[in-house]
């Protein structure tokens, strides 16, 4: 379900990130609309994960702004950043579950840190979130007892514990088998449609991108910035930029009149 009205919940303005003499990207500007699934794509080293970390507030940019409902998180105080992080959920590639804690204890962390809810209410929320990701009954398992896909779903349950307005996901399907990846795509779609959660996702999995994305932003390492924005199928069918075409068609430039498939 696409957002019914284009109201930006996050605005990125003229964002530049540099590490010493290395410019990762510069002058990147876009908006994240309320209720949409926005997928950030691009080749290795283009700055996808760096951009995500800046948007989360884990990294400071060289210059530029990221506005969340008018507050610039790049210049926010610790207290303001704390308030912002209560409105977002994050899942990195590794799922980042604490191995020494049960799944229940992992999901309880943000609830005990950011709320004054009583233990019974917290327990009810945990059970509800586990049910949402089809992990009911696994609350007392340790992460080591779960498959890769189950760990990702447990990570999503923890990221959703505080009912965030924005969910950030980094390479959700990386390293998973096709069936598990499809199940996670369905979970993303159902969560977005049922709760209206805005999502910002870094991905390179084409099948997943076509299925879940309302809109795509493409970064390019050589261009040091954003080179395309739009619906994934429209970019695939109508782009004239060879860099965008090579990504969405998974092709290398033809040599000697032959078309060559790109292998990830």
Where are the language model's segments positioned?
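Conserved ABC transporter NBD signature motif
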Residues: 64-72
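Conserved ABC ATPase signature
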Residues: 142-146, 150
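A short, proline-enriched helix->beta-strand linker immediately N-terminal to the Walker B motif
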Residues: 161-165
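The feature captures the beta-strand-to-loop junction immediately N-terminal to the Walker
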Residues: 41-43
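Helix-to-loop junction immediately C-terminal to a conserved catalytic motif
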Residues: 56
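Conserved ABC ATPase "signature" region
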Residues: 71-72, 119-138
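Catalytic Walker B motif of ABC-type/P-loop ATPase nucleotide-binding domains
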Residues: 167-170
């Amino acid at each position: 379900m696409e957002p019914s009205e284009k109201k930006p919940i996050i605005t990125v303005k003229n964002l530049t990130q540099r590490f010493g003499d290395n410019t990762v990207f510069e002058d990147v500007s876009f908006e994240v609309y309320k209720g949409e699934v926005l997928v950030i794509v691009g080749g290795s080293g283009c700055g996808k994960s760096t951009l995500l970390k800046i948007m989360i507030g884990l990294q400071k940019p060289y210059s530029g702004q990221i506005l969340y409902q008018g507050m610039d998180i790049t210049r926010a105080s610790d207290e303001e950043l704390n308030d912002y992080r209560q409105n977002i959920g994050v899942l990195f590639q590794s799922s980042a579950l604490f191995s020494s804690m049960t799944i229940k204890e992992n999901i309880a962390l943000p609830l005990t840190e950011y709320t004054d809810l009583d233990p019974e209410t917290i327990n009810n929320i945990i059970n509800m979130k586990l049910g949402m990701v089809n992990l009911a009954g696994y609350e007392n398992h340790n992460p080591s007892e779960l498959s890769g896909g189950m760990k990702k779903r447990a990570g999503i349950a923890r990221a959703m514990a505080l009912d965030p307005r924005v969910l950030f996901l980094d390479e959700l399907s990386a390293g998973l088998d096709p069936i598990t990846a499809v199940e996670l795509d369905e979970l993303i779609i159902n969560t977005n449609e049922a709760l209206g959660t805005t999502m910002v996702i870094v991905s390179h999995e084409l099948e997943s991108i076509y299925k879940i994305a309302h809109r795509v932003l493409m970064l390019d390492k050589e261009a040091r910035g954003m080179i395309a924005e739009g619906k994934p199928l429209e970019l695939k069918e109508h782009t004239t930029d060879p860099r965008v075409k090579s990504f969405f068609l998974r092709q290398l430039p033809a040599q000697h009149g032959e078309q060559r498939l790109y292998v990830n």
